Structures are given as C-alpha cells and as structure tokens.
C-alpha cells in the first residue's frame, strides 16, 4: 500500500491532538531555555550599541552585501557581532536539541503504551542528547554554509538531513552513517518530504516576520510566545517525519 501525504498529515495531527499537553509544555520549556540562554550570554547593551548604524550610513550601505558591510566594520564591532551570532546560534542549538530529543523520546514512549510528561521525556532523552548535539551542530553548520552560497543548496541539504535525528536516535548508526541514510531516504521520497518542509519554512518565516510587530507583550514574553509557536511547528514536522520513517524503515532495513 503506497504511503500518501494525507495519511501522514492525519496521523501527525491525531498524535499532536492526543499529546497536546505534553508537546505544548515541551515547546514552552525549550523556548524558555533558548530565550534565557540568549539573554544570559548576550553582550551588554553598551556593547550592542556600537553595532548601530548612523542614519546617514543606512542609505549608503543599502546596496552592499552582508560580507561587504562586515568588512567595513571596526575590529571591535566585528567581535561584538561575532559574539552575538555565536550566542544566538548556541541558544537555538541547545533549545532545538532538547526539543528534538524530548519529542523523539515522547513519541517512542507513547508508541510503547507508556505515558510520560514533558519533563520525563527530556530526562529520558539525556543519553541520546550528546549524539543529537553533535549531529545537529554539523547539520546546522552545513545548512548555513549552503544558504550562504545560495538558498537552493541550503534547502536541499536541509531536506537531505531531515530524517537524520530520527535515524541516529532509533538505529545503532554513527552520525555520518545516519546522515547518509537520511539523504538516501529523503531524496527517494521527495514528494512526501518537500511539501511538509516548505510549509514548515513558511510558518517559520511568518513567525519571524511577526516578531518585530508583536508589541502587545513585553519583548521577552513575546519572544517566548513566538518561539513556542515555532517549536510547535517543528514538533508537528518531526512527528510527520517520524511517522514517515517508521513506514519506510522496513524497506530501508531490507536494502541495507
């Protein structure tokens, strides 16, 4: 029986509805951790102020690329920018690793008929977090490099590696073996993965657009709320990909 996107969407939404309390709490916890790490390690406002561009320089820098703008910065400005980028990347990486590890553990426990809370899922995921951290760090680095050169290579790499966290968690594979297996399965099932990932990217971009316009709440609270919504979108995508992999797994194991 062929695998259809409608079946996967239905199964994913059913799982999300049945486990909404645990998934919502997991999304909120990881969003809170990400925002708190970001605020804790972010440079002080005095240091950030040196990154501000005078109004008369905005029009002159409008036609410059990002690399050209960075090259025109002073060494002090470049160091502050590097620290800001490193803190943002580190905070997002930690939050994403906890979200992915906790959610994959939650899915596995529920599949075995066990009920676990969000905190229990994170606790039970601790043994797999180091491998997930390395995998997601490498994946993030490679995807960012792809996006730097052109958008299409970055998106293609993201699609290729989309199943790797699930594979490295469920199979006794090394990180690079999981990435290779993910690429093979992903490109063999592009019609099922690409629409889901494009929808996920669209939701992420919409939330990114709303951040600067969400002025009803204090900035920190607004960031946590929007990060939670972003995590929920990622959770739904991960449930979808997990369900897809479980259906593909017997076939993929037979070919190995």
Curated annotation (Swiss-Prot):
Membrane topology: Multi-pass membrane protein
Localization, UniProt: Cell inner membrane
The protein, known as: UPF0259 membrane protein YPO2199/y2042/YP_1997
Tagged with keyword Membrane: yes
Keyword Transmembrane part of the UniProt annotation: yes
One GO CC term on file: plasma membrane
Pfam families in the record: UPF0259
Spans traversing the lipid bilayer: 20-40, 90-110, 118-138, 141-161, 192-212, 221-241
Alphabetical UniProt keywords: Cell inner membrane, Cell membrane, Membrane, Transmembrane, Transmembrane helix
UniProt-listed InterPro entries: UPF0259 (IPR009627)
Lineage start: Bacteria, Pseudomonadati, Pseudomonadota, Gammaproteobacteria, Enterobacterales
UniProt source species: Yersinia pestis
Similarity comment: family membership: Belongs to the UPF0259 family.
